[in-house]
Amino acid sequence: MQNKRESYTREDLLASSQGELFGPGYPQLPAPNMLMMDRVTKMSETEGDFGKGLILAELDIKPDLWFFDCHFPGDPVMPGCLGLDAMWQLVGFFLGWVGGKGKGRALGVGEVKFTGQILPTAKKVTYEIHMKRVVNRKLVMGLADGRVLVDGKEIYVAKDLKVGLFQDTSAF
């Protein structure tokens, strides 16, 4: 694997969406508009609440982001499912970062709680992912807990985020 670092820029994340960051066969992040972060500020295999990995990432909020125009006209708010997807994206990114190969797919989440919202007046969303387990056998799978914060205030909590890496997704 190439380009294993502790942080990544927007340009790095865009390279990941094209399969160019870690190399052939490694999981890709989605391309814009579904890429839900601007940078990864920290990657660690040993930190986090469970000592199995920590990912910190950020999204700069701008009033002209695509989802504010359609969700909802006259009452713009970032869809909660996009924050959840960002957490899945980061778990998959972590799996590639630790050497896992395959195509990333979200496999589920145990529990999600929304206690706030992301409005166009916000400045920054922070994603915090605490890895609980990584399985690297025939199936590569990550299990994590995550939080979403807007301007420093926790607004979503997700328990047991699951992402798998698959060599063949035709039967998925």
From Swiss-Prot:
UniProt key word Lipid metabolism: yes
Domain of life of the native organism: Bacteria
EC number: 4.2.1.59, 5.3.3.14
One BP term from GO: unsaturated fatty acid biosynthetic process
Catalytic residue list: H71
UniProt-listed InterPro entries: FabA, FabA_FabZ, HotDog_dom_sf
GO cellular component annotations of the record: cytoplasm
Pathway this chain belongs to: Lipid metabolism; fatty acid biosynthesis
Localisation per UniProt entry: Cytoplasm
Recorded family membership: Belongs to the thioester dehydratase family. FabA subfamily.
Its biological purpose: Necessary for the introduction of cis unsaturation into fatty acids. Catalyzes the dehydration of (3R)-3-hydroxydecanoyl-ACP to E-(2)-decenoyl-ACP and then its isomerization to Z-(3)-decenoyl-ACP. Can catalyze the dehydratase reaction for beta-hydroxyacyl-ACPs with saturated chain lengths up to 16:0, being most active on intermediate chain length.
Protein name: 3-hydroxydecanoyl-[acyl-carrier-protein] dehydratase
Gene: fabA
